Regions:
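Hydrophobic pocket-lining residues within nucleotide cofactor-binding pockets
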Residues: 21, 229-230, 298-299
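Long recognition/docking surfaces used for binding and targeting
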Residues: 17, 24-128
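Conserved S-adenosyl-L-methionine
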Residues: 134-262, 270, 275, 284-285
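Short, conserved SAM-binding segment of the class I
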Residues: 267
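Non-catalytic accessory regions of SAM-dependent methyltransferases
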Residues: 1-28
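Single conserved hydrophobic/aromatic residue that forms the stacking wall/gate
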Residues: 294-303
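Conserved class I S-adenosyl-L-methionine
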Residues: 285-292
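Conserved phosphate/pyrophosphate-binding and hydrolysis machinery centered on Walker-type P-loop NTPases
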Residues: 6, 111, 115, 138-142
Length: 303
């Protein structure tokens, strides 16, 4: 099976996570094609890469399955990466590909976890597939991410929220800044990772990439919520989130379609604690005559 354009970034994410697994990293080069006995006992003809694909899935599940919060347990991580089982690739070049990723990307990344590596991969794969023009896919440039997080003026005590997380770039940037502010205090850094970074994402692929990204960047308990942040005020998840986590800073780059940016502004203001701060990229369309009233009302509410 050829890897679909929409799954290439997930495949790359899966390999990066699998390489985190010591057993997989040691054994993948020695994995062989299915034996005659395996073929004889299988209901279906097994592809040459069957055992390697299976090992990748097992390593992914082993690494990530128990490291997300209860809001996201409905995501079946084995199912999310299940397409890997059908990748029909000759074993030798397949293992060579993984080896190149390990040597040229994974190992350097282990020494410098600051990059939004999955976000960059997602952008590359989308552009090659000719899908980068989708207005609902917002890929924030690094310099904008750096600026917005600086404008948030984060402290080590802040609870940071992104209501349209994408691949998790803002949360990773915030995690890095807050971890530096902790000045080597391991207990404080652990608290930041475990309890102070939250994100909503409704797209399954982006959600999986964001969780994978946060995992790869050292946050083993990514507080990602699979769902729509534009939820009703009276809903259970809304009430529980606001009551429990009390976010002080919200950093977002919302989808640009129709009046979605304004809706995200209102929702962020509802979720933020009093005297909280919202940092947002707003498209110029929000200043035209059709949206200006909503924009003005949102500004008044923020005051």
């Amino acid at each position: 099976m050829k890897i679909k354009d929409t799954e290439r970034s997930l495949f790359f994410a899966g390999l990066m996570i699998a390489l985190k697994d010591t057993n997989f990293r040691i054994t993948y080069k020695n994995i062989q094609a299915p034996t005659k006995e395996q073929q004889d006992t299988s209901k279906y003809k097994l592809i040459e890469s069957h055992n390697l694909n299976k090992a990748i899935i097992e390593a992914i599940v082993n690494q990530i399955n128990n490291r997300i919060n209860s809001y996201s347990k409905e995501i079946n991580w084995k199912g999310q990466f299940a397409f890997i089982l059908d990748i029909d690739y000759e074993l030798k070049p397949y293992k060579e590909l993984i080896s190149k990723i390990e040597k040229n990307i994974f190992t350097p990344f282990e020494f410098d976890e600051k990059q939004d590596i999955l976000g960059k991969a997602y952008k590359i794969f989308l552009s090659r597939a000719g899908k980068i023009d989708n207005k609902n896919i917002i890929l924030t440039p690094d310099h904008i991410k750096h600026l917005m997080v600086r404008l948030a003026r984060l402290s080590v005590d802040d609870i940071v929220l992104d209501t349209c997380t994408g691949t998790g770039g803002f949360l990773m940037e915030a995690m890095e800044v807050m971890s530096k502010l902790a000045k080597g205090n391991d207990e404080l850094i652990e608290r930041i990772h475990r309890h102070q970074l939250y994100g909503f994402e409704i797209d399954r692929t982006l959600f999986a990439l964001a969780c994978s990204n946060m995992f790869l960047h050292g946050d083993g308990r990514s507080n990602m919520i699979f769902g729509n942040s534009l939820i009703e005020v009276g809903s259970k998840i809304y009430s529980e989130f606001k009551r429990t986590y009390k976010p002080r800073k919200c950093i977002i780059n919302p989808p640009y379609e129709k009046n979605l940016p304004i809706q995200f502004v209102y929702k962020a203001l509802e979720l933020l604690e009093p005297n909280g701060k919202l940092i947002i990229v707003m498209p110029s369309i929000t200043l035209n005559k059709n949206c200006l009233l909503y924009t003005s009302d949102a500004a008044d509410e923020a005051r």
